[in-house]
Amino acid sequence: MDVYKILTRQQWAEVVASGQFNGAAIDLVDGFIHLSTARQLIETVRRHFRSQVDLVIVGIDTERLGDGLRWEPSRGGDLFPHLYGSLPVTAATALIDLPMGPDGEHQFPPGPWH
């Protein structure tokens, strides 16, 4: 099963260079890396990445995350995947551009989130 992380293209370049992602500012404050399921992804982007450009969707294989992956209640009581520890670049299964449309909304390409 894949889960997803939204990153800037620059953050992804840093992940590739270092071999792992230790978290964005909010992840570091909360003590875990915030991830989303396909069903949760569009709302996550709307709430937390509105108007941010140069974003990518990183697909992540949950089987490669080990026991640091936990499913915990969050928005509306829905269970969200949280990763306690670093995200290894080797867990990535896909890198998908998330462009901004002329209406100021992110334009999700075809995928499991629709």
Model-found features: residue ranges?
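Conserved, structured core segments of small domains
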Residues: 1-114
